[in-house]
């Protein structure tokens, strides 16, 4: 929005306020006439008519009306509307200059022997480690839950109902997948050929023994559908999916008690660095509110943006991270639920993808020596456990960390929705920056206090981010969340 547009809107807002208050003044005058005693009616009517005419004619009184409490209220409301119009939501266009437009997302089927993510099933970035076999007399048997979803066919060859038993997380993902199958192929239902196994018919380290794995197919046994079935399983939220055989798909999930699930938000490591506008690199643990760091705008171009708050900051917490290694040598370390910018060359568009769903041969945006963000191939995906989490939020909603472009958001798959969800915090930061007293106080503090003291004051999850995380389970569909 340019300055001329802002000036035009502001002029219209001022004129509207004056008109509304003049009308209110006229209505109040007429009300007083109706309430006056009979003996004074005629004289008061004449006087009030003269006053009304004066209001319409005298610009000094018009200016006075604009400063009445009601006029100030209207002016404040219109100012807020003007600010809202000035907000820009996040787009996903091509990186650099003019490299395409965002299109609808298409789902691509998996190929035979492909796994998502491309990690060992037992790594923390996938379904996680084995916890132990569950028998009917095991204390953990009570943690298994039956699945009576009528949209799912359970083969149950044993006749004991064992195939209906599974972990809570597995049941949740399986139910989500069943809806996707019916939407994709009307009249076809999801077929579960194996779930919890008590007869030890699988390998020694199978997650079937814990109720954390299912073997699935479609009810029509059409093998041409299985590649897309595997993709739908990935979209449903299974933590590890394998197109293991032409006859079926294998899926598994993390343990219900995994601490990896409890940490729902997304962060970077404290040792990761951001590039300041001055050209210096700064560890995220030392980053402060007000620092201008390298980010990405809605056109996929490199820009500098202010840090307005920290979504989370805890330098002592142990956490599992995903590491994305690129062919340029850049390595990004981030929590699995964090959104990463992934370039889709076949569609010439950018997608925001959860870090644990980025695969080898995908392209991410890397800040290179030319000063621009360019696509580079991911050559390896690994996992690591480290201490400390830091999640800065910039005004753009993106940040370049260790030379790799990433979102500031996590947990939900929509970058635009997450960016709008934080609009109140951006507005609050803007209003605070306009306050002279606040600016003078900040200037005085800068002379006597290290700049990173702002960041040092916070330890833990920001109250607003925490509120959004709690609300998301009630207002967002499961397919939009990283669960």
Curated annotation (Swiss-Prot):
Enzyme Commission number(s): 3.1.-.-
Site, Cleavage: residue positions: 266-267
Enzyme class: hydrolase
Lipidation (N-palmitoyl cysteine): 93
Lipidation (Cholesterol glycine ester): 266
Protein's UniProt keywords contain Thylakoid: no
Site (Involved in auto-cleavage): 335
InterPro entries reported in the protein's UniProt record: Hedgehog, Hedgehog_Hint, Hedgehog_sig/DD-Pept_Zn-bd_sf, Hedgehog_Signaling, Hedgehog_signalling_dom, Hint_dom_C, Hint_dom_N, Hint_dom_sf
Biased amino acid composition, Low complexity: 41-50
Residues that make up the propeptide removed upon maturation: 20-92
Signal peptide: 1-19
One Pfam family per UniProt: HH_signal
A molecular-function term among this protein's GO annotations: calcium ion binding
Record-annotated site: Involved in cholesterol transfer: 312
Annotated region described as Disordered, given as residue ranges: 28-57
Record-marked site positions (Essential for auto-cleavage): 338
Binding positions for Ca(2+) 2 per the UniProt entry: 158, 194, 197, 199
Keywords, ordered alphabetically: Autocatalytic cleavage, Calcium, Cell membrane, Cytoplasm, Developmental protein, Hydrolase, Lipoprotein, Membrane, Metal-binding, Morphogen, Nucleus, Palmitate, Protease, Segmentation polarity protein, Signal, Transferase
Subunit field text: Interacts with shf.
Record family assignment: Belongs to the hedgehog family.
Name of the featured protein: Protein hedgehog
Record organism: Drosophila virilis (Fruit fly)
């Amino acid at each position: 929005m340019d300055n001329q547009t802002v000036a035009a809107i502001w002029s219209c807002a001022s004129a509207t306020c004056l008109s509304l208050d003049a009308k209110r003044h006229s209505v109040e005058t007429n009300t007083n006439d109706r309430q006056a005693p009979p003996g004074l009616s005629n004289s008061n009517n004449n006087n009030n008519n003269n006053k009304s005419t004066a209001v319409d004619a005298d610009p000094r009184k018009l200016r006075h009306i604009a400063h009445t409490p009601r006029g100030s209220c209207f002016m404040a409301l219109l100012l807020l509307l003007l600010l809202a119009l000035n907000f820009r939501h996040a787009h996903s266009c091509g990186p650099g200059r003019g490299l395409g437009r965002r299109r609808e997302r298409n789902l691509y089927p998996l190929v035979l022997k492909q796994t998502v993510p491309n990690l060992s099933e037992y790594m923390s970035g996938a379904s996680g480690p084995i916890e132990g076999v569950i028998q009917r007399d095991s204390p953990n048997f009570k943690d298994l839950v039956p699945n009576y979803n009528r949209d799912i066919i359970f083969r149950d060859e044993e006749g004991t109902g064992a195939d209906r038993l599974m972990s809570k997380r597995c049941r949740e993902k399986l139910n989500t997948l069943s809806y996707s199958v019916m939407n994709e192929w009307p009249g076809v239902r999801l077929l579960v050929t194996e779930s919890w196994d008590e007869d030890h018919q699988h390998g020694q380290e199978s997650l079937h023994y814990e109720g954390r794995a299912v073997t699935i197919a479609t009810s029509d046994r059409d093998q041409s559908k299985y590649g897309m079935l595997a993709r739908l399983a990935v979209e449903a939220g299974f933590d590890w999916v394998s197109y293991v055989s032409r006859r079926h798909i294998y899926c598994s999930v993390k343990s219900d008690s995994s601490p990896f699930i409890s940490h729902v938000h997304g962060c970077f490591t404290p040792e990761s660095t951001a590039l300041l506008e001055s050209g210096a690199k700064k560890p995220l643990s030392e980053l402060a509110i007000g620092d201008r760091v390298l980010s990405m705008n809605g056109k996929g171009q490199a820009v500098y943006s202010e840090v307005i708050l920290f979504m989370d900051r805890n330098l002592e917490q142990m956490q599992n991270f995903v590491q994305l290694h690129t062919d340029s040598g850049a390595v990004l370390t981030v929590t699995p639920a964090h959104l990463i910018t992934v370039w889709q060359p076949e569609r010439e568009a950018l997608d925001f993808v959860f870090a644990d769903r980025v695969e080898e041969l995908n392209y991410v945006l890397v800040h290179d020596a030319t000063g621009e963000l360019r696509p580079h191939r991911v050559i390896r995906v690994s996992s690591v456990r480290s201490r400390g989490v830091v999640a800065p939020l910039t005004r753009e909603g993106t940040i370049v960390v260790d030379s790799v472009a990433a979102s500031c958001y996590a947990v939900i798959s929509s970058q635009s929705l997450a960016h709008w969800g934080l609009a109140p915090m951006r507005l609050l930061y803007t209003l605070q920056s306009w306050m002279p007293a606040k600016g003078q106080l900040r200037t005085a503090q800068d002379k006597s206090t290290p700049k990173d003291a702002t960041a040092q004051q916070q330890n833990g999850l920001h109250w607003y981010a925490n509120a959004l995380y709690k609300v998301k389970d009630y207002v967002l569909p499961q397919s939009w969340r990283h669960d």
